[in-house]
């Protein structure tokens, strides 16, 4: 039984008994037994564990976890301490520096954002080592769509940051006029120069939150 330790337990309890999820669970059992899979089994739901639904102010949507050793720990774009900062996150830090003058930290550990109400959610929560998108289409997308739908129902305003085509597909789930979404290309080096750099999503997010009487996010990640 999955224990998230906050309001997500009640909000998702029916979901974890759905046939698609039970099938996904069997698939994951086999994958973890026979393959190298990231993140660690106990880190799969960290995004939900760190950020309760009632606390969500911002959602940053990723695709699937990093597939290199020691990187993924259940939060989109974040890596564990002591691991080299991946290129997409380097570009996020660069945009933060240009937008809000944040210093570029020496690590990619984004727990500080999660603690402030930034839900760092991948649309697929597991991946085989070295094989991007290897767990796509197994059922994770149904669950993460449901999570987005639940957040969409919140009364308090939420900002959705949707970077890249995969993330932009989720716009159709956002029907609540209280929320807003900012979209751009993905921060990957392949696309960042085509509209991510200079998007000012971080200052725009804080502006929206403040206009709605919500405490803004301190985006500065401390160096370790």
Swiss-Prot record:
Q: Where in the cell is it found?
A: Cytoplasm
InterPro entries membership: UDG_fam1, Ura-DNA_Glyclase_AS, Uracil-DNA_glycosylase-like, Uracil-DNA_glycosylase-like_sf
What SUPFAM superfamilies does UniProt report for this protein, alphabetically?
A: Uracil-DNA glycosylase-like
This protein's record includes keyword DNA damage: yes
Q: What EC class does the entry list?
A: hydrolase
Q: GO annotations under biological process?
A: base-excision repair, AP site formation via deaminated base removal
Q: What is its main location?
A: cytoplasm
Catalytic activity of the protein: Hydrolyzes single-stranded DNA or mismatched double-stranded DNA and polynucleotides, releasing free uracil
Any matching Pfam family? UDG
State its Enzyme Commission number(s): 3.2.2.27
Name the domain of life this protein comes from. Bacteria
**Keyword Transport applies:** no
| Alphabetic keyword roster | Cytoplasm, DNA damage, DNA repair, Hydrolase
Q: Which family does it belong to?
A: Belongs to the uracil-DNA glycosylase (UDG) superfamily. UNG family.
Q: Which HAMAP family match?
A: UDG (MF_00148)
Q: What does this protein do?
A: Excises uracil residues from the DNA which can arise as a result of misincorporation of dUMP residues by DNA polymerase or due to deamination of cytosine.
Q: What is this protein called?
A: Uracil-DNA glycosylase 2
Biological source species: Listeria monocytogenes serotype 4b (strain F2365)
Give the lineage. Answer: Bacteria, Bacillati, Bacillota, Bacilli, Bacillales
The protein's gene is named: ung2
């Amino acid at each position: 039984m999955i224990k998230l330790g906050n309001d997500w337990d009640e909000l998702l309890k029916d979901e974890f008994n759905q046939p698609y999820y039970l099938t996904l669970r069997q698939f994951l059992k086999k994958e973890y037994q026979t393959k190298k899979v990231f993140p660690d089994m106990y880190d799969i739901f960290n995004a939900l564990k760190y950020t309760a639904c009632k606390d969500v102010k911002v959602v940053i949507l990723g695709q699937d976890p990093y597939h290199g050793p020691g990187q993924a720990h259940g939060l989109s774009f974040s890596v564990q301490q002591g691991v080299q900062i991946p290129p997409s996150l380097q570009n996020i830090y660069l945009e933060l520096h240009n937008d809000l003058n944040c210093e570029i930290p020496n690590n990619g550990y984004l727990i500080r954002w999660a603690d402030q109400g930034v839900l760092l959610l991948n649309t697929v929560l597991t991946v085989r080592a070295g094989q991007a998108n290897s767990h796509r289409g197994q059922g994770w997308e149904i669950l993460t769509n449901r999570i987005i739908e639940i957040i969409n129902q919140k009364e308090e305003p939420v900002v959705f940051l949707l970077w890249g085509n995969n993330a932009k597909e989720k716009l159709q789930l956002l029907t609540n006029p209280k929320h807003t979404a900012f979209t751009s290309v993905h921060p990957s080096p392949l696309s960042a120069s085509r509209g991510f750099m200079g998007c000012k999503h971080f200052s725009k997010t804080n502006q929206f939150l403040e206009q709605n009487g919500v405490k803004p996010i301190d985006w500065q990640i401390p160096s370790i």
